[in-house]
Amino acid sequence: MKKLFLMAVVMLASVASYAQHAVGSFTLQPKIGMNIASLTDADDSDARIGLAAGAEFEYQVTDMISVSFGALYSMQGCKYDDATVKLDYINVPILANVYVAKGFAVKLGLQPSFKVNYKYSVDGDSFDGEKWGPKANGVDLSIPVGVSYEYNNFVLDGRYNFGVTKAFDSKAEKSKNSVFQITLGYKFDL
């Protein structure tokens, strides 16, 4: 029994040693997942569930630290009883990743986002947001904070994007994007 236990520990240790990449290496990680998005100060609104998909590049600086940047299509906004505010962006996360345990990283960074779609949907009919509501800012800035776990090159990533800038170009409208994002990706060594 002791030999079996020792063999299992050795096997797990050898698998775990591949969970983090070598210093100086680059990886590409295509990923797909979902957003649970809302707008701060949007009274009586609910979260909009949407797609998050794209890719990130990562450079392993030291055994414990890496930097990453990427581009993700991100469906954001919020929902009301009979309407949906659709604010879709191309997010460009720039992150510092600290590996606190084998395969487990804590992330913090800055994320500019570029608006690619803004619509209101009311009772199934879709309207141009710029004509129907307040003008949306073309560029949004947020602070992503998150964690990820990598096993056999599969990466489960959860992060919260704190909106820093207002989503709309209006003195009366002070809403900011607030997005919880969870994705599953796969890292390829480059």
Residue ranges of model-derived segments:
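Residues on the lipid-exposed face of transmembrane beta-strands in outer-membrane beta-barrel proteins
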Residues: P30-M34, L51-Y59, A71-Y73, V92-V100, ...
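Short glycine/proline- and aromatic-enriched beta-strand/turn motifs that initiate or cap beta-hairpins
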Residues: Q20-Q60, F162-G163
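Glycine- and aromatic-enriched membrane insertion/assembly motifs of diderm outer-membrane
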Residues: T27, S45-T84, D88-I90
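Bacterial Sec-dependent N-terminal signal peptides
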Residues: M1-F26, K31, L184, F188-L190
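Short, solvent-exposed beta-strand-terminating loops
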Residues: Q111-K119
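Outer-membrane beta-barrel channels and translocator barrels
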Residues: H21-V23, T62, A101, Y151-F154, ...
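Outer-membrane beta-barrel translocator domains and adjoining extracellular loop/strand segments
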Residues: T40-D46, K79-V85, Y118-F127, F168-E173
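Predominantly the C-terminal beta-signal and adjacent terminal strand-loop region
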Residues: G70, Q76-I90, K131-L190
